[in-house]
Amino acid sequence: MFIRAGQYKSRPRVLAGIFLRSRDTQAERARRKAEEIEELRRDRQHVQRDLASAQEKIADMKIQIVQLKIDNQQRQPPVLPHDPALPCHEFGPKIISVCVNLAANVGLRASVRCMDIVLAWLGVDERLPDWTTVRGWLMRMGVAALEAPIEQADDWIWMADHSNQIGQEKALAIIGLRASKMPSPGTAIRHEDVRLLMFEPGINWKTADMSAAYERLAEKAGQPLAVLTDGACELRDGALTLQNDRPDTLLVGDFKHHAANVLKQVVGADERFSKFTSQTGSTRSAIQQTELAHLMPVSVRPKAGFMNLSATLKWANMVLWHLSHPHSAAREQITPGRMNDKLGWLRSFRDDVARWSRCQDVVSLSVTFVNEQGLFCGAADQLSRRFRSLELCGASQTVADGLLEFLRDHELKLQDGQRLPMSPEILESCFGLFKQLERQHSKGGFTSLLASFGALLQLATPESVRDAFSRVSVKQMRTWVSDNLGTTVPSKRKTAYAESKTVA
């Protein structure tokens, strides 16, 4: 300091005072800045606390808003989706598709009742169609499915069968699927995999009639790659005419029907089996109104024959087990004397039932294999290897040989890489859906409801409803019924009763 003091004109004492005052001034300024910084820090902390509090309040308010929306929705009655009515209709395609799908599953009258129950539960005041209206919708959908354009292709596989109830009328149904669109091996054919190609009611379905029907369908869809039928000769022989225009058209037999025939040849030819079935029928009548009713033999339709043998054998094995286990829960309140008197006869058939069950095991395994895998080169060899998992005896080996021979005979008709279905169970299932729709009327003869058959294969959607109703009017649907059904058995019955009242 003093070394450089010569630079200044003022005295050192004056300079020292100036420097001391400057230092004090800077110190005071620094102190004030520090106080300002501390005050700003405190303000920042207050702001952060206020911000956190505000964020908590916002989160709480969001929760309250969600709850208020829920409460508001609960207070307001539900409304059905927007569904403008179709032209010249009182209802929209959404409600129509729902009613049609319900009718196909639970019945016509029940479909409207179900809708009424659901809407009442939701608190929705909505007018519903009458069940007769739903019936008309279903019939229009069926006719539209039948008259929809068929894709021309050379790999159609047809499945043909007849359905009849009472009277002379039979309905010919032919469904089809493309070989190129078959489900992958291991997957059975579903309703959505097929489409209705032909559906014609008629009285006479002889070989010539079937040939004409096949030719009419071939004009629309092209010559088929294969035709699958059951054992009915008119269905099988009628398809021979198709080979005139396409020699490589394959005629495929129904594996399940053949399996039932093999069972009939092996098991049905057993004298013991005739005695067994006779005793089974007597037992059913004897115990159906007693304390043994839960052990009653199953009811088997005579027409089903050996196709439903498994249910009877399952019953026999169940009863034989309980005969050997007197303390089973199923035998409570049944005295040993009553059990032996009514069901003890099965003991003498124990070995027979075991033998027949082994035959049925062969058939069950084979039918499942064919349903899932189809017919292909090497199918018989694969099935033969699966038989190794079964306990075979002389009778069951005979059944196995008969089924393998049937497969090998069909394999000879195939080209390399071809794979075809060998069971029309999907078509039989379609007939079952129709009988389910008819309910108690399924034994009274065909009615105009037959027009709805084509609507049962696919679920209705708003889009399919629009398409079907744009192509088939009520008048066209009634024309189809008039042209194809004529006077039905129920109509004739109604006329007969009406005439008798008039005369009386």
Model-assigned labels for residue ranges:
Residues 3-14, 28, 37, 63-101, ...:
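Basic, short loop/linker segments at the boundary and entry of helix-turn-helix/winged-helix-like folds
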Residues 23-26, 30, 37-40, 44-47, ...:
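Heptad-repeat positions
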Residues 33, 51, 58, 232-242, ...:
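Acidic/histidine-rich catalytic cores and adjacent linkers
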Residues 67, 74, 78-93, 108, ...:
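RNase H-like nuclease fold core
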Residues 93-101, 119-123, 195-199, 412-416, ...:
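Glycine- and acidic
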Residues 102-119:
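Short, charged amphipathic recognition helices of the HTH superfamily
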Residues 248-264, 417, 423:
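RNase H-like polynucleotidyl transferase catalytic core
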Residues 267-288:
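A polyampholytic, Gly/Pro-enriched intrinsically disordered region
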